[in-house]
Amino acid sequence: MSCWTLVQQDFLEAPSVDALKTSLESKNDYVKISAMKTILRVVINGDSLPSILMHVIRFVMPSRNKELKKLLYYYWEVCPKYNNDGTMKQEMILACNSFRNDLQHPNEFIRGATLRFLCKLKEPELLDPLIPTVRQCLEHRHAYVRKNAILAVFSIYQVSNHLIPDAASLAEDFLAAESEGTCKRNALIVLFTIDPEKAKAWLLANFEQIPSLNASSLLVIIEFIRKVVLTKADGLEKLRFQSLLVSLTATNNSSVVFEAATSVINVFPDAESLKLAASRLLALADREADNNAKLIMLDRISQLAARDKSILEDLITDVIPFLSSSDFDVCEKAISIIMGLVSSRNVEDILNHFQKELTKSNGETEKDDGRRRALTKAIHSCAINFPHTAATAIQYLLSHISDFQSKSASSVLSFIKEVMEKFPDLRSSNITKLLLSLKELRAGKIFRGVIWIAGEYCLTEDDIRVAWKSIRASLGEVPILASEEQLLKDVSNVPEDDLLIDISAPASTSRKVLPDGTYATESAVTSEALSAARLEAVKASKKPPLRTQILSGDYYLAAVLASALTKLVMRFARLSFDKERLNALKAEACLIMTSIIRVGQSKFVKYTIDDDSVERIMNCIRAIYSFEELPEFQTVFLDDMRKAFSSLVAQSDKRQKEADLLVNGSDAVQADELLNIRQFQRVIEEKQDLNFESDIIQATNDGMVVEDLASKLDHIVQLAGFTDPVYCEAYVKIQQFDIILDILLVNRTDTTLQNLSVDLATLGDLKVVERPPPMNLGPHAFKSVQATVKVSSTESAVIFGNIVYGGKASDEDKIVVLNGIPVNIIDYIKPAFIPESQFRSMWTEFEWENKVDISSNEDISLYDFLHKIMKKTNMNCLTPDASLRGDCGFLSANLYACSIFGEDALMSLSVEKSVSGPISGHVRIRSKTQGIALSLGAFV
């Protein structure tokens, strides 16, 4: 199969035909080589140069220069071989004689190169005289000649089968006598293509010797078996071919094992064969060092598990070792496969393995934290889907919660919250264990989660007492300000030599007379520096963990603590009639809250408390003192907040079910849908394309949508006007990573436009990989050409260019400037969903931000405005729908999308609307690269 590259010809430096002839007549081989290269460029670009043929035969053909010989063969491929009346040129007889001499040359490499050239010839008149010599080459002593000779036989048969009618017999005899691996492979290709029946008979006759062939031959045999089993094999033959494929999965070559196992999976649907093929793929993935190869094979296992997970349930132990892979992608893929195979029979064993891997992943890197999050999510899913394992899972996570980093601990806390909500029986025992871990926690985010859980799910008097004691122990002595002042007073009694005083602080100086009568300067550390050193000593002293977080400026945690204490007091009032104990709790809660406010306004904290936190804490104090007279406070704190979280969990479950339905929806069929049974289809005729369903689905599963006529018309772009000499329009088709332009050219003049070419260029991260060839366009004629542009990222880009036509001289060329084609990045962005915690993590990580101000006079609600933004940017809203509805005057939402290149795009929308005013606000877009952030901002 020939493949050409069009090289742009520089007409300013193109020599004349006479100059080329003179160069060919030169005795210097380098001059001839340069001339031949020029001739090849000119001929490939459309000028046949018929008068140069005889000079090539006279002055180039006799040369022994290897590079010149190579260029000569290229010339024979492209040069015109027929006269205008369709008869063969007489000069080609001389060329044919030269080919025959080269086929009989004593040098085997010249023979082989000539045979390779014959594979590209398509003229039966030239091939016919060479057939006897080609047959002789099949018996040559050198394998290089033989392997090219059998391919030449194949090519000649395809050009005209009457030239070598016994090609199949030749290939069969060649196979019987041949021992070299590559020659056998080529002969198998010839036999399998020309005569499948003889090929099938050869396979069955040499059944026992096939596994001993080399890898390249086995790959050809595997491909043939797939074709013959799907089309023409009977039941007994299928069984024999199935056993052959199964035996090939036990070879030592990785490529053969992979292709054989994949063929078994695609062709033979019985459970035993599928299980065996899957086990061989897993074993192959285990011994392969390349992580990309592991991912490919695990992906095949994942596809098989999606078809029928019952087949692979027994192989789940073979997937578990991949959890220990150093590559996070391999580990994540293994987790995905395991979660697809988990059942009530093996869920406990799987949980144990997950817990072991979670214990081993104690590194501090980002990948280790990602691995912990993935394992935690898997444990979470197991516990939710199989409630009898929830107790074991949550006990393990609670006992190790202090070992997690902030990001992975958030996943653990989300899991614990969901378990508390869905499994009331597990609340009491796990609340106690969770509260006992307070003294070991260090991260403020984990503290917030634990304290929120305590305030929400301590539903008995005993649980409330345990929670109160744990919080008090983690908070330390109250009032906080008084205890810190006392500690500062105690530090004042420490000798100055034991304090770390800042020597860079301003010092007071004085002049002093020494005993010998000279003057000296005496310096003393000021009292301010001494006080600062004592204050730093107080701040650096060891304190309970919750107290440390508050003094370091985490007032969000302080507000959560105030809310939790308020809930505990109100719930105790509902459960108990002990007024004395209730009053004590109320007093202590108010003391803690007021002490937080006071210490937040003192010098003992890193940052002064903000007004929002003060207001939140003061509201909690008012609620504690007023809830008995105003029951609405209890309704808000105890009932409405719980309902809000329950609604959030229910909505999350609903969204997960919708996502699962979207993934597995292709498996659902209607009750009256026709069954496609391959055995009942009519026999496929020869030369008809084979319908390999699995291969086609795997090769073309790119989410392409078949467009109707109206949709196609929307993608037509007019590039030139009707008054231009050449009218031009293009149909823009997006196919995965390529933009395909179907360009229509119409000659509006009464003359022939010669050397017409469409020159395209790009602005942005695009590359023109296939350009339209030059052409001649007759009067009022039209022609369709195609260009392909490769897209590398989702940055804004433009395709522009012009049409050039005219004579060979540059001053005669005429140009039609084309309109630009803007590339719409929305076609490459797909809405997607990620958890809120992952969104926040990515928001912190991404460095590029594009802030766009919004001002709209449209008379629509903020909710409708959000959906308009989602439609324009093709993004998905992560904020729960219940949080967005209503008549509130402001709206804040998080949106997410992912490009087909794997780029993530995050958007935070904040808008407000007055009663009669416009919608105003801003959008913040973040991504890893600047291009996608700027491009999305242009659509807002």
From Swiss-Prot:
Swiss-Prot/TrEMBL HEAT repeat ranges: 11-48, 90-125, 126-162, 310-347
Entry's Gene Ontology molecular function annotations: structural molecule activity
Keywords noted in UniProt: Cytoplasm, Cytoplasmic vesicle, ER-Golgi transport, Golgi apparatus, Membrane, Protein transport, Repeat, Transport
GO terms, biological process: endoplasmic reticulum to Golgi vesicle-mediated transport; intra-Golgi vesicle-mediated transport; intracellular protein transport
Topology of this chain in the membrane: Peripheral membrane protein
Major location (coarse): cytoplasm
A GO cellular component entry from the record: Golgi membrane
InterPro entries, per the entry: ARM-like (IPR011989), ARM-type_fold (IPR016024), Clathrin/coatomer_adapt-like_N (IPR002553), Coatomer_bsu_C (IPR011710), COPB1 (IPR016460), COPB1_appendage_platform_dom (IPR029446)
Compartments in which it is found: Cytoplasm; Golgi apparatus membrane; Cytoplasmic vesicle, COPI-coated vesicle membrane
Pfam family, any one: Coatomer_b_Cpla
Complex formation: Oligomeric complex that consists of at least the alpha, beta, beta', gamma, delta, epsilon and zeta subunits.
Function: The coatomer is a cytosolic protein complex that binds to dilysine motifs and reversibly associates with Golgi non-clathrin-coated vesicles, which further mediate biosynthetic protein transport from the ER, via the Golgi up to the trans Golgi network. Coatomer complex is required for budding from Golgi membranes, and is essential for the retrograde Golgi-to-ER transport of dilysine-tagged proteins.
Protein name: Coatomer subunit beta
Species name: Schizosaccharomyces pombe (strain 972 / ATCC 24843) (Fission yeast)
